[in-house]
């Protein structure tokens, strides 16, 4: 990392458009140096690795902007910076030619990058409350500590969270994030959780265990995904994980209620078991926002293997497009599907209800209660082995000038889907079951796009439903990060 003087021009990455056109993005450049501020907490060799993998590889002006955006994003994701900004200083041209001088001399613009980093807080402690769907409420206490570079060279952050709520009896979570390289993060979780699994009467689930995951985001693919003329910030990553825990399942106490009121399926879930999961997740997200996108597309594919117990796969696709000024009208389509196969040598031994798919709810198929679709035993939702769900949504800014710039949106939706137990029949038969007799709903409402979460208040109207489905006609409130 070096500094330089004699600066002729300067431009901030926050407003790059004035210097960009079709030809300027191809202009040859050389990064002559990087001037940094706020980097005392970072080991120099670690920061140099991030620079070498991003902006130092740039050979054109367009590549420099792409790589600078990747660098800023990566520093924040890896807990190295709370915020990062860059500006470029242009020092005029030098000239290069090949040794045999068979080609014309090429002007090469020299650039010095000014990287300003807002260091993350070394220690934070906070307490608060969370509110969610179905009258969920939680109180939490959280501590977070940044490990000093003199103790551990790799950027590492540890987190401790203690939580208690209406459905979570108690929760203890220890999180450790270590940046192995500019492209990968190692995450270790140690947890102890006791919570109520939401059914008609419910199960009390206790889990004690650990989860080790490695997230890998190949930087070289950003050259293909990123467009310097737009505000898109594409994400592509693989995540591999190993999770093992001891799971205890108990039937909830219902006071004087007789035990026989529980279904046989629910009673069969009681007991203890060792749960081990090997998993992989692939995500390609080209949307401009995670919770409330206005354009772009997303693909997410998840796979889980529990040796000797089950194999589970799930696919999600989302496409968003907007029209008119300031994205006045936004159209979103989403489809999800999943399949679970019982690998147990004893086919009569069922997959645990918590490992099965569930459908229905204010953030899933609207117009139905949470876990309101699919197979039931008496009054209990027992989950399914395969599902399909889809949603069409149209969002519009409020048609009044005083509030059209607000974060509120009018919302119309059409949702549908089906959840089945295929009993390890052929895939063809399973697809046949999923392709007909869907439960569907429609409705209108109001959406609030808050930076921390998305709020929905919809008036829902179920159109078609199965006999055992639990419908929700009328107003339905939704709160969350991801919606169908």
Curated annotation (Swiss-Prot):
Recorded hits in Pfam families, A to Z, give: Omp85
Q: Where in the cell is it found?
A: Mitochondrion outer membrane
GO cellular component terms given for this protein: mitochondrial outer membrane; mitochondrion; SAM complex
List UniProt keywords, sorted A-Z: Membrane, Mitochondrion, Mitochondrion outer membrane, Protein transport, Transmembrane, Transmembrane beta strand, Transport
GO BP: any one term: protein import into mitochondrial matrix
Q: Does the keyword Mitochondrion apply?
A: yes
A GO MF term: membrane insertase activity
InterPro entries in the record, alphabetically? Answer: Bac_surfAg_D15 (IPR000184)
Q: How does it sit in the membrane?
A: Multi-pass membrane protein
Q: What is known of its domains?
A: Its C-terminal part seems to contain many membrane-spanning sided beta-sheets, that have the potential to adopt a transmembrane beta-barrel type structure.
Protein function: Component of the mitochondrial outer membrane sorting assembly machinery (SAM or TOB) complex, which is required for the sorting of proteins with complicated topology, such as beta-barrel proteins, to the mitochondrial outer membrane after import by the TOM complex.
Q: Describe the subunit structure.
A: Component of the mitochondrial outer membrane sorting assembly machinery (SAM or TOB) complex, which at least consists of SAM35, SAM37 and SAM50. Associates with the mitochondrial contact site and cristae organizing system (MICOS) complex (also known as MINOS or MitOS complex).
Report the sequence similarity comment from the record: Belongs to the SAM50/omp85 family.
Protein name per the record: Sorting assembly machinery 50 kDa subunit
Lineage of the organism:
Eukaryota, Fungi, Dikarya, Ascomycota, Saccharomycotina
């Amino acid at each position: 990392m070096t500094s330089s003087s004699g600066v002729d021009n300067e431009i901030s990455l926050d407003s790059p458009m004035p210097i960009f056109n079709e030809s300027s993005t191809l202009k040859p450049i050389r990064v002559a140096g990087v001037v940094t501020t706020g980097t005392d907490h970072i080991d120099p060799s670690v920061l140099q690795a991030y620079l070498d993998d991003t902006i130092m590889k740039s050979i054109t002006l367009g590549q420099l902007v792409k790589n600078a955006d990747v660098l800023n994003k990566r520093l924040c994701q890896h807990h190295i910076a709370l915020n990062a900004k860059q500006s470029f200083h242009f020092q005029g041209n030098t000239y290069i030619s090949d040794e045999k001088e068979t080609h014309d001399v090429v002007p090469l613009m020299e650039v010095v990058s000014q990287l300003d980093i807002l260091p993350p807080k070394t220690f934070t402690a906070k307490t608060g409350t969370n509110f969610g769907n179905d009258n969920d409420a939680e109180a939490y206490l959280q501590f977070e500590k940044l490990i000093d570079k003199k103790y551990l060279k790799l950027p590492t952050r540890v987190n401790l969270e203690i939580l208690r709520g209406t459905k979570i009896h108690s929760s203890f979570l220890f999180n450790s994030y270590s940046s192995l390289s500019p492209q990968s993060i190692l995450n270790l979780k140690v947890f102890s959780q006791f919570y109520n699994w939401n059914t008609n009467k419910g199960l009390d689930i206790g889990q004690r265990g650990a989860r080790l995951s490695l997230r890998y985001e190949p930087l070289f693919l950003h050259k293909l995904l990123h467009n310097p003329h737009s505000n898109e910030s594409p994400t592509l990553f693989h995540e591999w994980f190993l999770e093992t825990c001891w799971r205890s399942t108990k039937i909830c106490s219902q006071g004087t209620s007789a035990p026989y009121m529980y279904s046989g399926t629910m009673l069969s879930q009681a007991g203890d078991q060792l749960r081990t999961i090997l998993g992989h997740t692939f995500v390609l997200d080209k949307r401009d926002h995670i919770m409330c996108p206005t354009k772009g597309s997303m693909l997410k594919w998840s796979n889980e293997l529990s040796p000797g117990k089950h194999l589970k796969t799930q696919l999600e696709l989302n496409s968003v497009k907007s029209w008119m000024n300031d994205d006045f009208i936004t159209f979103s389509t989403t489809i999800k599907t999943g399949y679970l196969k019982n690998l147990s040598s004893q086919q009569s031994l069922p997959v645990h209800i918590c490992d099965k798919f569930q459908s229905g709810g204010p953030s899933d198929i609207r117009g139905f209660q949470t876990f309101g679709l699919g197979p039931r035993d008496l009054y209990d939702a027992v989950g399914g082995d395969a599902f399909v769900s889809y949603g069409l949504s149209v969002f519009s800014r409020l048609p009044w000038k005083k509030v059209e710039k607000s974060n509120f949106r009018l919302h119309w939706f059409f949702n549908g889907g089906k959840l089945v137990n295929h009993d390890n029949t052929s895939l063809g038969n399973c697809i046949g079951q999923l392709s007909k007799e869907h439960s569907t709903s429609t409705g209108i409402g109001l959406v609030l796009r808050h930076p921390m979460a998305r709020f929905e208040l919809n008036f829902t109207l179920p159109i078609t439903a199965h006999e055992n489905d639990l419908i929700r006609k009328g107003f339905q409130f939704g709160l969350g990060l991801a919606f169908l």
